[in-house]
Amino acid sequence: MKVAVLGAAGGIGQALALLLKLQLPAGTDLSLYDIAPVTPGVAVDVSHIPTAVNVKGFSGEDPTPALEGADVVLISAGVARKPGMDRSDLFNINAGIVRGLIEKVAVTCPKACVGIITNPVNTTVAIAAEVLKKAGVYDKRKLFGVTTLDVLRSETFVAELKGLNVSRTSVPVIGGHSGVTILPLLSQVQYAKWNEDEIEPLTKRIQNAGTEVLNAKAGGGSATLSMAQAAARFARSLVKGLSGETVVECTYVEGDGKYARFFSQPVRLGKEGVEEILPIGPLSNFEQQALENMLPTLRADIELGEKFING
């Protein structure tokens, strides 16, 4: 099994490289790529950690050598948010970066499962889909927006608020990966009883958690470490699924289009990537209203990505 990280010299990428070296199954090949010349050095650095994961690093304009034979590709390349920016401000720079990398994926490893980390995910996943479609290699079972950080944050905040064991706390998060499109289904959390006045503030905290980190870092960075752990968890789940295990994760994929062309919800992962998109289950009145309110934003984000490729 080979996992490639594109954008491996960045704040998320370096932390992700470290976590994958520690967490991927023995015998996995880990391929690190970034345009920055430091990338082979990042690979040497993590290669000194004693685990049975083999690491190679590549830099320069062309990611092809890093992508050859990849089963899983994680894309974290691009610019990060700074204070005062929202994820859509990143669009103009990151859209072109994702397009260029996906064009290489389409040629070099068209059957790989691709996880998009680069923001704005609501839009960059649509860009990736349209590039793969133009190349004639799009398989909607193999393209994912990595929204796992919303799940991690929800699990953490719910466990803190309710005094639950965080390792046993599971919170499905549906919708998209920015602002109002992030919808944690708090009504589905086991062993948590909610007061009406808790739901809305907690939902807003989860939706704005990225900004919480931005402000706390006082202009010195965005949520890189928690994002890296979220991406590592998703990568591990993909690898398990590809190896024949049954794993369920919330992730942003193209489904039946009931809510939007791309939508994050629980997905059963398997040997072909998406094995089954699971139902979102019963919603509270608050969640139902929040879902209806987010859809115009989510659909507009997706359309922006489609138009970027198709004009």
Curated annotation (Swiss-Prot):
It holds the Pfam family Ldh_1_N. GO terms for molecular function: L-malate dehydrogenase (NAD+) activity. Changing V107T: In strain: a7205, BR355 and e6181. Keywords: NAD, Oxidoreductase, Tricarboxylic acid cycle. Changing V107I: In strain: 162, 375, 723, 788, 800, 1008, 1124, 1158, 1180, 1181, 1207, 1233, 1247, a6062, e6158, e6229, e7066, f6237 and 1209. InterPro entries: L-lactate/malate_DH, Lactate/malate_DH_C, Lactate/malate_DH_N, Lactate_DH/Glyco_Ohase_4_C, Malate_DH_AS, Malate_DH_type1, Malate_DH_type1_bac, NAD(P)-bd_dom_sf. PROSITE patterns: MDH. Substrate binds at R81, R87, N119, R153. GO terms for biological process: malate metabolic process; tricarboxylic acid cycle. Catalyzes the reversible oxidation of malate to oxaloacetate. NCBIfam families: MDH_euk_gproteo (TIGR01772). Homodimer. Belongs to the LDH/MDH superfamily. MDH type 1 family. This is Malate dehydrogenase. The gene is mdh.
